[in-house]
Design a protein with these regions (language model features):
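Short helix-capping/linker segments at secondary-structure and domain boundaries
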Residues: 45-55, 104-111, 201-203
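Alpha-helix N-cap and coil->helix boundary residues
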Residues: 52-55, 92, 152, 169, ...
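Short, well-structured alpha-helical segments
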Residues: 54-58, 91-98, 125, 136-143, ...
Length: 203
């Protein structure tokens, strides 16, 4: 995408945003529980967040509050079946939770603060994308969950672009447009992400 084209799309989207009303949002804080962070990151793809994902994340936070680090979560998975911990039966998702947990443990990532710093290194992101089921959206979502500034382009954000008359964008193109819009509006990436997500989730 050329710089001129990016600026044109971003300006178009800014103008569209200014015709809408959005609920106020505050900066998201990490869970400070890697089991919850990993579970949220893996389950969010393709599932209803409020009805399916967050209740399971909350279950981990409440019932296994002492198992905060990546190592703790791996130990927890040795003590109880993961299907019971998460209360979820999809074997593919459960295996991805295991895979991501071991990957982060093997890379010395034990908490969200370490994860935030680790995700700032480009070569680490390249390694992370080699884990089965981890694509650019999950990487960006992990950045958000760790407290970093990021925007994770999901179906809601793609649909919002379509509403603004901007269609057929790749993930990277949409990411560039939204990043430019956040800069133009002088708001954080997370704030832009959350405002649009909440707006579209009500539709």
């Amino acid at each position: 995408m050329l710089d001129e084209e990016l600026c044109n799309y971003a300006t178009e989207l800014v103008n569209f945003i200014q015709t809408k009303e959005f609920a106020p949002v505050t900066q998201r804080k990490p869970y400070y529980h890697m089991g919850a962070t990993i579970t949220d990151a893996i389950l969010q793809a393709g599932l209803n967040y409020h009805h399916v994902v967050y209740p399971r994340v909350l279950k981990i936070l409440v019932e296994y509050s002492d198992y905060k680090t990546t190592c703790d979560f791996i130990i927890l998975m040795q003590l109880f079946p993961l299907v019971e911990i998460v209360n979820f039966k999809n074997s593919k998702k459960l295996q991805r939770i295991r895979d991501l947990s071991w990957f982060l443990y093997n890379n010395g990532v034990e908490n969200e603060d370490q994860l935030a710093k680790w995700l700032d290194v480009e070569k680490n992101i390249s390694l992370l994308k080699k884990v089965n089921g981890i694509g650019p959206k999950t990487v960006d979502y992990l950045k958000i969950l760790s407290g970093n500034q990021a925007i994770a382009i999901d179906r809601h954000l793609f649909a919002f672009l379509e509403m603004a008359g901007i269609s057929h964008c790749s993930y990277n193109e949409a990411h560039l447009i939204y990043s430019k819009v956040a800069e133009m509006l002088n708001i954080s990436l997370y704030e832009l992400d959350k405002k649009i997500w909440l707006y579209m989730a009500k539709k």
